[in-house]
């Protein structure tokens, strides 16, 4: 799992050198993006997607809320477009491209840099904002296919519930190489296994027999 600061609430800003940045700061769920109308004042990736027409302002979150397009445009204009001498749409596009590049670099960490060819894989776009970025990311990373699952906004929570519980333990033994006592080493492994079994039993979500 590689984590990066590029989610729907990641804040876009211009640094002291005049470069457009996205993240690592986030507006979170509250106040959230400016377009949520909950008091947010700094433009986010979600605001940029809205400005570019990738989100329907009148049907968001299954129609449970509407988005403030005017507020999103004004926030991007003030924080990004004017300082950079860009149009609002141009600044919004830059925000999205920077976010996409960060995600592509993260993909390369777990693919190319580990000896895997991205062309052999499918990109699954999930998360609240994932589907809005998946195709462009796949193009840049050289991934030939994209899958958007049903209910992508709940995929992470579902994965948490169904994934295997994994725990790691370690122990340090300091001995001379000519004084290694294998029964002592075996005893440490047994102790670690017992501790792992107890931790597994204590985990509320754990079920089944542990494997070591």
Kindly label every feature range from the protein language model.
Residues 1-212:
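N-terminally biased helix-coil "hinge/interface" segments that flank
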